[in-house]
Amino acid sequence: MFCGSPFLGISSWSLASAALCPPSCSFSAGRDLRCDAEVPEVKWTAFVRTLVTRPLSADDVWDFVSTFAHCRLALSWPVGAELRFATSDMLGITQAEVAKLSRRYGCCPGMDLTVIGVTIFAEVSALVLVGECGEIYAFNGVFDDALYRLAEDAFGLWKHGLRRFEPVYGSKCLTETGASFFGGMSGVDDVLAFAVSFDKALVPLPWPRGAFFEFAVPGRPEKRWRLIPGGGVAVVIGRFFGRGVTSPLLRRQRVLMDQVGRVYAASLDGGAVVRLSDSFRAFLAMGVRKLFKNHRFPPGHLWTMQLPVTCVHAPVIDLPAVYQLSPHMVERGMPVASCEASTVVRGDCEETETEESTSGDSVLVC
């Protein structure tokens, strides 16, 4: 845990107010800044124009943040969320702390991070940083000891907002389907009692579309419990159901909850346990995204109970399925470079004409 700066473990509005208000403001320490209409707003075009520049310079980012310090950028999701621009100096964060954050959580040890401000929604706030490739991260050591990649670039932040920042889903101000109704179930005893009393009850999940969570506790006592990594024990509380559950992976999963309320998914055949959320409320608001996508960097890259996050510095290269080649190259079986990748085309490839071709060239399909 980082303790040198309050914003590496921010958990209260008083800290946010003190750091993000200009010196001339006479705001009280606990004032809710979301309702302050006098704070200037930054247009998305200016923000995107700065961060899409390649190569991205830390000096350019610092100049932009300094120019628009104390201004806000409205985020698309959730409603009311915003980004307040502030430099690391304004937030009391040293470069050594930022470097330590990069070493402990980043996908690469030497990843450069630049502080651009704080994101705010209800009681949830987090430090926002930009990586050397333009990717955007959020960190709050109090809500979750992990670094979240909010988006791969500025366009992604404009589109997704805070959808990848899991602590938001546990907020009481987030009115997602099912989350507010079942929000009182904080522990495994509450959920287990409800599951037993209302067997087969269905709750719609936001993702995937058409999927439901069905309360279903196994009848045999020995089937109700499952050991999870770390020596803990979780109880089976239900499964996934509905037209949206088309994947064989989902049909084999059972939903578990441990004694502190964290929700997991585990396969019937004894496969890996995957952490879905830190609370039942967050699970009902997030759905089952964590079984397929993950944007959370744990400390020390300990990928226990979660999918590894791809590194933006070494992207996966997808080879094209169709190559446009000349006939003599096919006859000789020569290696041909296409999209910076090499392949050898067999001489028995079928030559077909495509309707989309406007140049009259033949398209060879293996």
Swiss-Prot record:
InterPro entries noted in UniProt: US22-like
Family label: Belongs to the herpesviridae US22 family.
Name listed for the protein in its UniProt record: Protein U1
Lineage: Viruses, Duplodnaviria, Heunggongvirae, Peploviricota, Herviviricetes
